[in-house]
Amino acid sequence: KVPFDDRIVAKQALLSREDDPSEDMHPVFSLEDVLAVTGGQLIAGNTEKTIYGISTDSRSIQQGNLFIALQGENFDGHAFVPRAVASGAAGVIVHDVSQISPEAVGRTACVVEVRDTLKALGELAGAYRRRFAIPVVGLTGSSGKTTTKEMLACILAQEKKVLYTEGNFNNQIGLSMTIFRLRPEHEIAVLEMGTNMP
């Protein structure tokens, strides 16, 4: 009889992941890739940095992530750059470098300035999508998108490993973040896109 405790095995698995941040964090971009895809300008740091994962929320930053400082109606991501860097962001993308102080990024994070951070997010998602030679089903319309997406993903999942939009995470940000969840094991993607602008 071999002693087995699933709690111990689970803990060992989690601890082994902490040793290598690249183990479960995608997408992986070099900073040179980020600059080439976005047309951004490197303000601080060096191009030898590797990015593990993309985040637009400073509260969920993981070690090695690239934080993209989006600007919304009620918030400005530039205000959260210090929190993102303190939480382990390897780099930040901003549209106005004058809004962040050198102390906010310290010596560890890279700073890339672009004209439009939302556009940069979409460009990075597009570049990441092109790494996968899988079919993509896009759903849009004025009503019924989420229900149709859920049904289609459920049907396809009977035969394939499916990536699909969670809930109604279907705006420009949500679509990009869904694409960043693509993994080599996925065989098809079902993506929902809202129609709130021309």
Task: Put a short name on every predicted segment.
Residues 119-198:
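Phosphate-binding loop of NTP-binding sites
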Residues 1-123:
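N-terminal leader/targeting and accessory segments in enzymes
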